[in-house]
Design a protein with these regions (language model features):
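Conserved ABC ATPase signature
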Residues: 144-148, 152
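Catalytic Walker B motif of ABC-type/P-loop ATPase nucleotide-binding domains
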Residues: 169-172
Length: 253
């Protein structure tokens, strides 16, 4: 059975102008992202990882080329239409979570979903289910962001990304600011939601985080120079880790 493509690019380019000089960050990129995959984007600094992530989600407009998301060419949408599409179909987890200090944990979680005009009662029910799933105790739901640990805040960020039932969760270095213990907890959550069918695209420079992915894409100079299929994550799978290390070595990482 053929894999279902959820995002596809055709000759995607992203160019920035700095001091009158054109910098070509993404170059004629043809890429397919498959539904249900935990896709990891790796590469050296400046390879275009985060730029690609933001382009795929429509957060940053492509300079040239096409991006088909759930069969729709989002490059043809106006900025307002792209924002509406993004709120409905995308969830985001960043290195810095940016929870709103004046809002409770529950209200922070609901904030993204309410922008999609879903019923608050339905969103609240879903939020409670996911908060429990990621082990955010009910006693924390009415508390405020400054009362959370770094790992708890990042898990709340993941719940916020999931509450509107997105097609894809986009994660940009989600464990970059966390210690080892909190990093493991966040990776466990991402792995768990992927096993339930959630499509994830994650940018990371960390081999431990990358090891949770089912498919690794390696970027170099704005184009894909290799990829590696790892399949679904299983704890303690040393062969999987060795395969990833060999692939990254081959890529010159």
């Amino acid at each position: 059975m053929a894999e279902e493509i959820i995002i596809r690019t055709e000759k995607l380019c992203k160019t920035f102008s700095t001091g009158g000089v054109q910098q070509h960050v993404i170059k004629n990129l043809d890429l397919e992202i498959y539904k249900g995959d935990f896709t990891v984007i790796m590469g050296s600094s400046g390879a275009g990882k985060s730029t690609l992530l933001y382009a795929l989600s429509g957060m940053d407009k492509a300079s040239l080329g096409r991006i088909y998301f759930c069969g729709r060419d989002i490059t043809k949408l106006s900025s307002d239409r792209q924002a509406i599409f993004r709120r409905k179909h995308c969830g985001f987890v960043f290195q810095q979570i940016h929870l709103i200090d004046s809002m409770s944990i529950m209200d922070n979680v609901l904030s993204a979903g309410l922008l999609t005009k879903q019923r608050r009662s339905e969103l609240t029910k879903r939020a409670k289910e996911i908060l429990k799933r990621v082990k955010i105790d009910e006693g924390l739901w009415k508390k405020f962001p400054n009362q959370l640990s770094g790992g708890e805040a990042q898990r709340v960020g993941i719940v916020r990304a999931l509450v509107n039932s997105p097609e894809v969760v986009f994660a940009d270095e989600p464990t970059g600011a966390l210690n080892s213990s909190n990093s493991d907890a966040v990776l466990d959550v991402l792995t768990d939601i992927n096993k339930s069918g959630q499509s994830i695209i994650m940018v990371t420079h960390d081999i431990k985080s990358a090891g949770r992915g089912s498919r690794i894409i390696y970027l170099k100079d704005g184009t894909v120079c290799g990829e590696c299929r790892l399949g679904q994550y299983t704890p303690g799978d040393t062969a999987r880790h060795d395969k990833l290390k060999a692939f990254l070595s081959e890529m010159g990482w």
